[in-house]
From Swiss-Prot:
Pfam families: Ribosomal_L2, Ribosomal_L2_C. Its main location: plastid. SUPFAM superfamilies: Nucleic acid-binding proteins, Translation proteins SH3-like domain. This is Large ribosomal subunit protein uL2c. Part of the 50S ribosomal subunit. InterPro entries: NA-bd_OB-fold (IPR012340), Rib_uL2_dom2 (IPR014722), Ribosomal_uL2 (IPR002171), Ribosomal_uL2_bac/org-type (IPR005880), Ribosomal_uL2_C (IPR022669), Ribosomal_uL2_CS (IPR022671), Ribosomal_uL2_dom3 (IPR014726), Ribosomal_uL2_RNA-bd_dom (IPR022666). Belongs to the universal ribosomal protein uL2 family. The keyword Metal-binding does not apply. One of its GO terms (molecular function) is rRNA binding. GO terms for cellular component: chloroplast; mitochondrial large ribosomal subunit.
């Protein structure tokens, strides 16, 4: 969708750039309320994820990541905004009466027909196993475990590429640049996720960020020593360390957070950039 620029009428709209007007009228049987009281705290009330809290109430849309309506054609009825993700979603009416939401593929319009299964056409929005796809196919919503549903390449504008097939595995290049092996029996959706211009959005004011449930970020160098390792000193002082650290004293800015010796390390041929 196109990016809408506000006319310069107030300071808060001077730098604003939002998505085009996409309405949201979700079906009642495909939504449910979420519990939003954690605010980044654990069961003991201790902050485990900083800078979270507040935000507008949301209703969660049930998204069909499995695409298990096999060999039944479906028609795109609506393209809707989803507050829980930066990609748009489509309401699909299947031939057997089933109604489900899926991620909106780039270029799909209302009235298009999609289908999932084996030996289906290689066209935008169709879901099929990797073994039935030709090399070079652009895909999204990729399964890691057979039957669990898509887990990779689901964000707005995300697209992966099928670059090789050998034995029981297929080699994919993911949006992060990582190259990894996945079972050829796992399914994926053809095409790219829509709303590719999401990175051109500009919230324009602090209140828009608060609507998203994100609180202000305070630099550690302006805190007291009791609050952050970078804090303290007279006036504008350096951090006093060789390298930046987190509030808990661990190395920051570049420290790898992936668990060591994870079982899936053998499937990763090249780490992400």
């Amino acid at each position: 969708m196109a990016i809408h620029l506000y006319k310069t009428s107030t300071p808060s709209t001077r730098n604003g750039a939002v998505d085009g007007q996409v309405k949201s009228n979700p079906r009642n049987n495909l939504i449910y309320g979420q519990h939003h009281c954690s605010k980044g705290r654990n069961a003991r009330g201790i902050i485990t994820a900083r800078h979270r809290g507040g935000g507008h109430k949301r209703l969660y849309r049930k998204i069909d990541f499995r695409r298990n309506e096999k060999d039944i054609s479906g028609r795109i009825v609506t393209i809707e905004y989803d507050p829980n993700r930066n990609a748009y979603i489509c309401l699909i009416h299947y031939g057997d009466g089933e109604k489900r939401y899926i991620l909106h593929p780039r270029g799909a319009i209302i009235g298009d027909t999609i289908v999932s299964g084996t030996e289906v056409p290689i066209s935008m929005g169709n879901a099929l196993p990797l073994t039935d796809m030709p090399l070079g196919t652009a895909i999204h919503n990729i399964e890691i475990t057979l039957g669990k549903g898509g887990q990779l390449a689901r964000a707005a504008g995300a697209v992966a590429k099928l670059i090789a097939k050998e034995g029981k595995s297929a080699t994919l290049r993911l949006p992060s640049g990582e190259v990894r092996l996945i079972s050829k029996n796992c399914s994926a959706t053809v095409g790219q996720v829509g709303n590719v211009g999401v990175n051109q959005k500009s919230l324009g004011r602090a209140g828009s960020k608060r609507w998203l449930g994100k609180r202000p970020v305070v630099r550690g160098v302006v805190m007291n020593p009791v609050d952050h390792p970078h804090g303290g000193g007279e006036g504008r002082a350096p951090i006093g360390r060789k390298k930046p650290t987190t509030p808990w004293g661990y190395p920051a800015l570049g420290r790898r957070s992936r668990k060591r010796n994870k079982y899936s390390d053998s499937f990763i041929l090249r780490r992400r950039k």
